[in-house]
């Protein structure tokens, strides 16, 4: 199993603290276990380690944010840089291509793709472990984690599901 963290957004949601160069995921606003401050990116990597997911992490980011990622995480992760921002899907394709062609990963290896600016509890990673086990047991080829919406917004996509009798739901096509 490998993890791709998506960290290429412009992150203007916390303007003026964040901007096109310094996105919200790099701001050290969260309290770390040692009482110091950590960024969302640092928190996600720490939580992955605390959850026992001792797997390689690749961060997909923009060229302008590469140095910030390296500064905050050092050699804990590998960094893949997009020549220019092209949104989520191209970032995933670039990182997956890097893993396949440069790192020569097994094409059957599970890859977890997640944003680096999530604020989650450790139980989130238990769910990821269960999802990977389901993939490895050939229960599915692709899995997507989502939440039930409280109301609807045109900002998000929605998936119609049906209960498959287990921990997971199947998408209705």
Positions of predicted regions on the chain:
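Polyanionic, low-complexity intrinsically disordered segments
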Residues: 159, 172-173
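Intrinsic disorder/low-structure terminal segments
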Residues: 25, 167-168
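Glycine-rich, flexible loop segments associated with nucleotide phosphate handling
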Residues: 37-44, 107-111, 170
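Conserved beta-loop-beta/alpha segment of the NTase-like Rossmann-fold superfamily
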Residues: 74-167
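N-terminal glycine-rich phosphate-binding loop and ensuing alpha1 helix
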Residues: 1-69, 75-77, 81-86, 98, ...
């Amino acid at each position: 199993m490998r993890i791709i963290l998506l960290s290429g957004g412009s992150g203007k949601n916390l303007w003026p603290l964040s901007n096109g160069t310094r996105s919200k995921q790099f701001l050290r606003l969260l309290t770390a276990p040692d009482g110091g401050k950590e960024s969302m990116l640092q928190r996600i990597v720490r939580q992955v380690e605390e959850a026992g997911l001792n797997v390689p992490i690749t961060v997909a980011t923009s060229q302008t944010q590469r140095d910030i990622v390296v500064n905050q995480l050092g050699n804990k992760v590998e960094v893949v840089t997009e020549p220019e921002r092209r949104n989520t899907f191209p970032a995933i394709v670039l990182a997956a291509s890097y893993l396949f062609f440069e790192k020569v990963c097994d094409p059957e290896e599970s890859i977890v793709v997640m944003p680096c600016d999530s604020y989650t509890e450790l139980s989130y990673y238990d769910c990821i472990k269960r999802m990977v086990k389901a993939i490895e047991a050939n229960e599915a080829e692709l899995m997507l984690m989502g939440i039930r919406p409280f109301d609807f917004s045109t900002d998000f996509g929605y998936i119609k599901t049906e209960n498959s009798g287990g921990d997971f739901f199947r998408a209705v096509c």
